[in-house]
Design a protein with these regions (language model features):
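Short aromatic-glycine-(Arg/Gly/Cys) micro-motifs in beta-strand/loop hairpins
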Residues: 422-442
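Short beta-strand
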Residues: 104-108, 286-287, 472
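Conserved aromatic
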Residues: 63, 203, 261, 445-452
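Short, mixed-charge low-complexity intrinsically disordered segments
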Residues: 462-498
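A short, charged, amphipathic alpha-helix used as a generic interaction element across diverse proteins
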Residues: 438, 449-471
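Gly/Gly-Pro- and Ser/Thr-rich, intrinsically disordered tail segments characteristic of DNA damage-repair
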Residues: 1-228, 234, 360-398, 402-420
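DNA-contacting surface of Y-family translesion DNA polymerases
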Residues: 5, 186, 196-338, 347-362
Length: 498
């Protein structure tokens, strides 16, 4: 039996949902006038998270600064976001979709996939999709697009065709006429950097991409991504619509910031922290993950997310973190304030069924040793705040990151190398033994079983931050320490017990 997949996407979700609420309260319909949703209408530095169709026709779009939009349209109506209301609208939207098929995968707050293979049978999928679209409009007051296809990829591509309030199909026979003429950026998972690289080689449309061989693509984007791109450009996607039960077979962590962050080193630190937590959990349960996903929530509560497949299942923090960093570069411009960052792993394989690779990068043992030290510290220390990589930002020192210790992208990867993490002006260190929290006036203290590890840690810190200096101090009990100094003040003490 051939598959029939629907992708349902709310048209300009935040704007539509705000409009519905205004109409219910007797106000104007924001969808009929140039209007936008912004995090703080009174702050002209804020960005737009959603725009009405009249606003889009003027050139106003999501992610545009409010100041720029007001120059285009001084009469622009600007309304604040309402997250509680959006959540309620999303839940009601998903409930209607689930009534058509229990095999539902929520892809984001305003879109989902449903597997209609059994429900459709010999019935016309377009007729059912139209009924679903119209039911959402009549019951909830907002419009959606429904894409219909034989897999998730083609269904999602179809839903992005002409909007709003439309049903579109994209069957395999329609790929040459409907999908191949589109620009490469319109293909799912193709970001700005990949688009620029492809265009530089004369690949402008999805059809251009589809006509290349995997070997030709490998020379441009690497072997793993080449196979995925080639498959997507030709409409191939065997991934199932994953229900909530399957989704539970994953691990994730997120961090909401006390205040919106824009400093790349602070955001990188947060991403590092959640990567450590997630990787620790899958190691604890003897799993390895093949898929890494991440999301960021902007100041105005809009969300961007990405997902990628790894070369092989892993539980190594460094590989998970590097994948997350590559995705972060796709969704964040480096200047827009972020409210939250999250990371997850899925497609898990139990360690007992995996075979050890005989061709693993020799450096992997170093990365695994780093993870073992992290796991040991978490197991021995009940108060996680005493762990260096869990300390608050105002503590004495910033956490070490795998990038600052020289951890590269996944072994054997031919993907574009990951740029080094932003260097903090604070000291960087690695926990190798015991940690003692600093007093109000004293430094953070680390204790090691031997001097070699203590010296290696301080050298790593100095390499990461040239403003640091260190010297050796003999202690009364016969041990000695390497003290890290900034501007003549001791900020960390690395004690070697002999």
């Amino acid at each position: 039996m051939s598959r029939v997949i629907f992708h349902i996407d709310v048209n300009s979700a935040f704007l539509s949902w705000s409009a519905v609420k205004r109409v219910m309260e007797g106000g104007q319909d924001l969808r009929l006038v140039p209007s936008v949703v912004s995090g703080d209408p009174g702050d002209r530095r804020s960005i737009i998270s959603a725009a009405s169709m009249p606003a889009k026709k003027l050139g106003i779009r999501a992610a545009m600064p409010v100041t720029m939009a007001l120059r285009i349209c001084p009469q622009l109506v600007i309304v604040p976001g309402d997250w509680a209301w959006y959540k309620r609208c999303s839940e009601e939207f998903i409930a209607i979709c689930r009534s058509y098929s229990p095999v539902l995968q929520q892809f984001s707050i305003d879109e989902c996939f449903i597997d209609m293979s059994l429900r459709c049978g010999k019935r016309d999928p377009v007729e059912i999709a139209t009924r679903l679209k119209d039911e959402i409009k009549s019951r909830l007051g907002f419009t959606v697009n429904v894409g219909v296809g034989p897999n998730k990829l083609l269904a999602k591509m179809a839903s992005d065709f002409e909007k709003p309030d439309k049903v579109h199909t994209l069957w395999e026979s329609e790929i040459p006429s409907k999908m191949w003429p589109l620009g490469v950026r319109d293909l799912l998972w193709v970001g700005k950097k990949t688009e620029e690289r492809l265009i530089a080689y004369g690949i402008h449309t999805i059809g251009d991409l589809a006509r290349l061989s995997v070997g030709q693509l490998t020379r441009l984007v690497g072997q793993k991504f080449a196979a995925q791109l080639h498959g997507n450009a030709n409409g191939r996607d065997d991934s199932p619509v994953e229900t909530e039960v399957q989704e539970a077979k994953s691990y994730s962590a997120e961090r909401t910031f006390p205040k919106d962050l824009v400093d790349p080193k602070d955001i990188d630190r947060a991403l590092f922290n959640v990567a450590c937590i997630v990787a620790h959990r899958i190691r604890r349960d003897d799993f390895r993950a093949s898929t890494v996903s991440m999301f960021v929530k902007y100041k105005d509560f809009s969300v961007a997310q990405r997902q990628t497949s790894l070369d092989q299942p892993t539980d190594v923090t460094a590989l998970i973190l590097n994948a997350a960093r590559r995705m972060l570069a796709e969704v964040w411009d480096g200047v827009t304030p972020l409210r939250q960052v999250g990371l997850g792993v899925s497609k898990l394989t139990h360690e007992s069924v995996l075979q050890m690779s005989l061709f693993e990068d020799p450096k992997m043992e170093y990365y695994r040793d780093w993870d073992r030290q992290y796991d040991a510290e978490r197991a021995r220390t009940e108060d996680a705040r005493l762990l260096a990589y869990e300390r608050k930002p105002n503590a004495a020192g910033a956490p070490a990151t795998p990038e600052s210790t020289g951890i590269p992208a996944s072994p054997g990867s031919t993907a574009v190398p990951v740029a080094p993490a932003p260097q903090s002006s604070e000291p960087t260190y690695v926990v190798l033994r015991e940690v003692t929290a600093p007093s109000e006036s004293g430094p953070l203290v680390f204790r090691y079983p031997d001097g070699e590890k203590a010296l290696a840690a301080v050298k790593m810190a100095v390499r990461s931050d040239p403003s640091l200096r260190f010297h050796r101090v003999n202690l009364p009990d016969g041990s000695y320490s390497f003290d890290l100094l900034r501007d003549g003040k001791v900020i960390e003490r690395h004690v070697a017990h002999v």
